[in-house]
Amino acid sequence: SLRECELYVQKTDSREDEISPPPPNPVVKRGAISAEVYTEEDAASYVRNVLFSHLDDNERILMGSTLRMYEEFLSKVSILESLDKLTVADALEPVQFEDGQKIVVQGEPGDEFFIILEGTAAVLQRRSENEEFVEVGRLGPSDYFGEIALLMNRPRVLGPCSDILKR
Protein backbone atom coordinates (compact mmCIF):
# COMPACT_ATOMS: atom_id res chain seq x y z
CA SER A 1 0.00 0.00 0.00
CA LEU A 2 1.06 3.61 -0.54
CA ARG A 3 1.27 6.09 2.35
CA GLU A 4 2.03 9.79 2.37
CA CYS A 5 4.03 11.42 5.07
CA GLU A 6 4.86 15.01 5.91
CA LEU A 7 8.05 16.26 7.44
CA TYR A 8 8.36 19.67 9.07
CA VAL A 9 11.88 21.09 8.96
CA GLN A 10 12.78 23.80 11.43
CA LYS A 11 15.66 24.81 13.65
CA THR A 12 15.28 24.28 17.37
CA ASP A 13 16.54 26.53 20.12
CA SER A 14 18.81 25.39 22.93
CA ARG A 15 15.90 24.37 25.16
CA GLU A 16 15.21 20.81 24.11
CA ASP A 17 12.54 20.19 26.73
CA GLU A 18 10.13 22.67 25.12
CA ILE A 19 8.39 21.74 21.89
CA SER A 20 7.40 24.72 19.81
CA PRO A 21 4.52 24.54 17.34
CA PRO A 22 5.36 24.38 13.65
CA PRO A 23 5.86 27.76 11.99
CA PRO A 24 2.89 29.23 10.10
CA ASN A 25 4.43 28.38 6.70
CA PRO A 26 6.54 25.29 7.33
CA VAL A 27 8.77 23.72 4.72
CA VAL A 28 6.92 20.58 3.70
CA LYS A 29 8.44 17.55 2.04
CA ARG A 30 6.24 14.75 0.81
CA GLY A 31 7.40 11.23 0.21
CA ALA A 32 5.95 7.84 -0.50
CA ILE A 33 6.73 4.39 0.77
CA SER A 34 5.54 1.16 -0.78
CA ALA A 35 6.33 -2.45 -0.07
CA GLU A 36 5.20 -5.87 -1.16
CA VAL A 37 4.85 -8.75 1.24
CA TYR A 38 7.01 -11.78 0.48
CA THR A 39 7.18 -15.12 2.20
CA GLU A 40 10.49 -16.47 3.46
CA GLU A 41 10.43 -19.00 0.61
CA ASP A 42 10.04 -16.18 -1.95
CA ALA A 43 13.00 -14.36 -0.41
CA ALA A 44 15.17 -17.51 -0.45
CA SER A 45 14.24 -18.15 -4.08
CA TYR A 46 15.08 -14.54 -4.98
CA VAL A 47 18.47 -14.76 -3.24
CA ARG A 48 19.18 -18.07 -5.01
CA ASN A 49 18.27 -16.52 -8.37
CA VAL A 50 20.48 -13.48 -7.76
CA LEU A 51 23.42 -15.62 -6.62
CA PHE A 52 23.09 -18.03 -9.53
CA SER A 53 22.09 -15.52 -12.25
CA HIS A 54 25.66 -14.97 -13.42
CA LEU A 55 26.41 -18.71 -13.67
CA ASP A 56 25.99 -20.92 -16.72
CA ASP A 57 24.17 -24.28 -16.45
CA ASN A 58 27.31 -26.29 -15.62
CA GLU A 59 28.34 -23.81 -12.92
CA ARG A 60 24.82 -23.93 -11.42
CA ILE A 61 24.95 -27.74 -11.23
CA LEU A 62 28.41 -27.61 -9.65
CA MET A 63 27.31 -24.94 -7.14
CA GLY A 64 24.22 -26.99 -6.21
CA SER A 65 26.31 -30.11 -5.61
CA THR A 66 28.83 -28.07 -3.60
CA LEU A 67 26.01 -26.76 -1.44
CA ARG A 68 24.60 -30.27 -0.87
CA MET A 69 28.07 -31.56 -0.04
CA TYR A 70 28.70 -28.84 2.56
CA GLU A 71 25.13 -28.38 3.85
CA GLU A 72 25.21 -31.03 6.59
CA PHE A 73 28.78 -30.13 7.50
CA LEU A 74 27.99 -26.39 7.73
CA SER A 75 25.00 -27.05 9.99
CA LYS A 76 27.48 -28.39 12.60
CA VAL A 77 29.56 -25.17 12.65
CA SER A 78 27.88 -23.04 15.32
CA ILE A 79 29.42 -19.71 14.30
CA LEU A 80 27.73 -20.00 10.88
CA GLU A 81 24.21 -20.85 12.14
CA SER A 82 22.68 -17.48 11.33
CA LEU A 83 24.24 -17.17 7.88
CA ASP A 84 22.76 -18.33 4.59
CA LYS A 85 24.29 -21.73 3.78
CA LEU A 86 24.30 -20.98 0.04
CA THR A 87 26.37 -17.83 0.54
CA VAL A 88 28.77 -19.60 2.91
CA ALA A 89 29.21 -22.60 0.59
CA ASP A 90 29.94 -20.20 -2.27
CA ALA A 91 32.69 -18.52 -0.21
CA LEU A 92 34.45 -21.74 0.84
CA GLU A 93 37.75 -22.67 -0.73
CA PRO A 94 39.06 -26.15 0.08
CA VAL A 95 42.71 -26.35 1.16
CA GLN A 96 44.84 -29.30 2.18
CA PHE A 97 47.78 -29.35 4.58
CA GLU A 98 50.58 -31.87 5.01
CA ASP A 99 51.19 -33.61 8.32
CA GLY A 100 53.10 -31.22 10.63
CA GLN A 101 52.61 -28.17 8.39
CA LYS A 102 51.95 -24.85 10.14
CA ILE A 103 48.55 -23.46 9.23
CA VAL A 104 48.73 -20.14 11.06
CA VAL A 105 51.45 -18.57 13.18
CA GLN A 106 50.88 -17.05 16.61
CA GLY A 107 51.27 -13.24 16.57
CA GLU A 108 50.80 -12.80 12.80
CA PRO A 109 47.82 -10.90 11.38
CA GLY A 110 44.89 -13.07 10.36
CA ASP A 111 42.95 -12.73 7.14
CA GLU A 112 41.57 -16.27 6.88
CA PHE A 113 39.05 -18.35 8.80
CA PHE A 114 39.40 -22.15 8.79
CA ILE A 115 36.87 -24.94 9.31
CA ILE A 116 38.18 -28.48 9.70
CA LEU A 117 36.39 -30.92 7.43
CA GLU A 118 38.61 -33.96 7.99
CA GLY A 119 41.58 -34.79 10.21
CA THR A 120 42.86 -33.00 13.30
CA ALA A 121 44.98 -29.97 14.09
CA ALA A 122 47.16 -29.49 17.15
CA VAL A 123 46.86 -26.06 18.75
CA LEU A 124 50.28 -24.84 19.85
CA GLN A 125 51.13 -21.85 22.01
CA ARG A 126 54.18 -20.36 23.63
CA ARG A 127 54.16 -17.81 26.40
CA SER A 128 57.39 -16.05 25.41
CA GLU A 129 60.07 -16.01 22.69
CA ASN A 130 62.40 -18.09 24.90
CA GLU A 131 59.92 -20.93 25.49
CA GLU A 132 59.06 -23.90 23.30
CA PHE A 133 55.60 -24.31 21.77
CA VAL A 134 53.27 -26.39 23.93
CA GLU A 135 50.16 -28.22 22.68
CA VAL A 136 47.16 -26.64 24.41
CA GLY A 137 44.39 -28.37 22.47
CA ARG A 138 43.27 -30.36 19.45
CA LEU A 139 40.69 -29.48 16.83
CA GLY A 140 38.74 -31.94 14.69
CA PRO A 141 35.92 -32.07 12.13
CA SER A 142 33.49 -29.11 12.39
CA ASP A 143 35.89 -27.19 14.65
CA TYR A 144 37.06 -23.81 13.41
CA PHE A 145 39.77 -21.27 14.14
CA GLY A 146 40.96 -17.88 12.94
CA GLU A 147 37.68 -16.09 13.56
CA ILE A 148 39.00 -13.80 16.31
CA ALA A 149 41.95 -12.51 14.30
CA LEU A 150 39.72 -12.06 11.27
CA LEU A 151 36.76 -10.37 12.95
CA MET A 152 38.69 -8.19 15.39
CA ASN A 153 41.66 -7.39 13.16
CA ARG A 154 44.09 -8.66 15.81
CA PRO A 155 47.20 -10.83 15.60
CA ARG A 156 46.65 -14.57 15.91
CA VAL A 157 46.56 -15.77 19.51
CA LEU A 158 47.26 -19.46 18.89
CA GLY A 159 48.95 -21.39 16.12
CA PRO A 160 47.30 -24.61 14.91
CA CYS A 161 49.55 -27.14 13.20
CA SER A 162 48.12 -29.85 10.94
CA ASP A 163 48.10 -33.46 11.96
CA ILE A 164 46.96 -35.23 8.79
CA LEU A 165 44.53 -32.39 8.08
CA LYS A 166 42.77 -32.90 4.77
CA ARG A 167 40.03 -31.11 2.91
Swiss-Prot record:
It holds the Pfam family cNMP_binding. A motif (Pseudophosphorylation motif) lies at residues 30-33. Keywords: cAMP, cAMP-binding, Cell membrane, Disulfide bond, Membrane, Nucleotide-binding, Phosphoprotein, Repeat. The modification Phosphoserine is found at S14, S20, S34, S82. GO terms for molecular function: cAMP binding; cAMP-dependent protein kinase inhibitor activity; protein kinase A catalytic subunit binding. PROSITE patterns: CNMP_BINDING_1, CNMP_BINDING_3. The modification Phosphothreonine is found at T12. Its main location: membrane. GO terms for cellular component: cAMP-dependent protein kinase complex; cytosol; plasma membrane. Regulatory subunit of the cAMP-dependent protein kinases involved in cAMP signaling in cells. The inactive holoenzyme is composed of two regulatory chains and two catalytic chains. Activation by cAMP releases the two active catalytic monomers and the regulatory dimer. Interacts with PRKACA and PRKACB. PRKAR1A also interacts with RFC2; the complex may be involved in cell survival. Interacts with AKAP4. Interacts with RARA; the interaction occurs in the presence of cAMP or FSH and regulates RARA transcriptional activity. Interacts with the phosphorylated form of PJA2. Interacts with CBFA2T3. Interacts with PRKX; regulates this cAMP-dependent protein kinase. Belongs to the cAMP-dependent kinase regulatory chain family. This is cAMP-dependent protein kinase type I-alpha regulatory subunit. The lineage of its organism: Eukaryota, Metazoa, Chordata, Craniata, Vertebrata.
